[in-house]
Regions:
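Acidic anion/phosphate-binding donor-loop and adjacent secondary structure
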Residues: 130-131, 170-185
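Nucleotide-activated donor-binding/catalytic signature segment of Leloir-type glycosyltransferases, i.e.
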Residues: 237-263
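Short alpha-helical donor nucleotide-sugar binding micro-motif in glycosyltransferases
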Residues: 267-272
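Conserved donor-binding/catalytic core segment of Leloir-type glycosyltransferases
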Residues: 7, 185-203, 209-212, 224-226
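Extended catalytic core of nucleotide-activated donor transferases of GT-like folds
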Residues: 7, 47-157
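Aromatic "clamp/platform" in nucleotide-sugar-dependent glycosyltransferases that forms part
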Residues: 280
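Helix-loop-beta element that forms the nucleotide-linked donor phosphate-binding surface
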Residues: 150-170, 177
Length: 293
């Protein structure tokens, strides 16, 4: 059986859980098959027009530059266009499979594709929105990270023969037990609880912080390290500091980290004493899995 030649459509650039999973997954997959990527997102260091517009992101490496062949950009209120990128890293081949790895209801799922197409989606509820679910049914295969999501999808009406479980992986060369030296404001003899994940009702962020403040007295040598910014929350509070103030949760033991670099994130995970997670629902929860590793 010949190996597939895959054209992936995904949000490759960025620092969200979806972005990190996408990069790790496609970097690994590219070691085994021909793979190229159409990317939807841009990072904070976006540089356009430019043949290499994502070089300002500190996580972009030569593998990424080879994989990234096309960039989607909005050209009008409801119109998108595709632009070639990283042409100095040749990766031309005729693909025979399309793979869409995106969040629920993303534009890429609704695009027209020639040939077999696979939908890879992470969702934290028992039901998909009806319009989106009907679109999923048009795909040749449906990939999900857990047996639970696969079972929910079949229960909603998908053909069991099309549903596959493809777990999200962890880079074991990056996430492994050790006691790394760090220059971060972190190793000071105090016990560190850590929370990584956007401020969200689903993730019980407010309740975790409330519980920490109720459990530990101010004179105890315990800190709560939080990286919980959510610029898309819709609550009008705009920042983690404003949310803590709004809910009466300000405390010097809460150490706020605004979107730390990948390197710093790894260091925080490895140096933390306890990783806290108490989500009402999760599609996968990559930071928790990485902390466990």
């Amino acid at each position: 059986m010949k190996k597939p030649k895959v054209y992936a459509h995904a949000s490759y650039v960025g620092t969200t859980g979806y972005n990190n999973h996408t990069r790790d997954f496609f970097r690994s997959l590219s070691k085994h098959i021909d793979l190229k990527v159409r990317n939807f997102t841009i990072g904070k260091n976006w540089n356009w027009p430019n043949n290499e517009p994502h070089n300002g992101e500190d996580y972009i490496n030569d593998t990424d530059k080879k994989l990234l062949v096309e960039q989607t950009l909005w050209t009008g209120k409801d119109t998108r266009s595709e632009f070639p990128i990283y042409s100095d890293y040749p990766n031309e081949f005729k693909h025979n499979v399309n793979l869409v790895l995106e969040e629920t209801n993303h534009h890429y799922f609704y695009d027209d594709y020639v040939g077999p197409k696979i939908a890879y989606n992470v969702w934290e509820s028992t039901l998909q929105p009806e319009q989106f679910f009907n679109k999923l049914l048009e795909y040749d295969q449906l990939w999900f990270p857990s047996q639970w999501q696969a079972d929910c999808t079949i229960a909603q009406g998908a053909d069991p023969n099309k549903v596959k479980v493809v777990p999200e992986g962890v880079d074991t060369k990056t996430f492994f037990p050790e006691d790394p030296v760090t220059k971060l404001d972190y190793v000071d003899g105090r016990f560190k609880f850590i929370v990584f994940g956007r401020w969200d009702y689903r993730k019980s962020t407010k309740e975790i912080i409330e519980t920490f403040l109720k459990e530990f007295k101010p004179n105890e040598p315990v800190d709560l390290i939080v990286s919980i910014d959510n610029p898309f929350s819709g609550d009008g509070l705009e920042s983690t500091e404003n949310r803590l103030k709004h809910f009466g949760l300000e405390d010097p033991r809460i150490k706020i980290k605004h979107f730390p670099s990948r390197e710093d994130y790894i260091t925080y995970i490895k140096n933390g004493h306890v990783f806290l997670s108490c989500a009402r629902s999760e599609g996968w929860n990559l930071p928790l899995i990485e902390a466990m590793a």
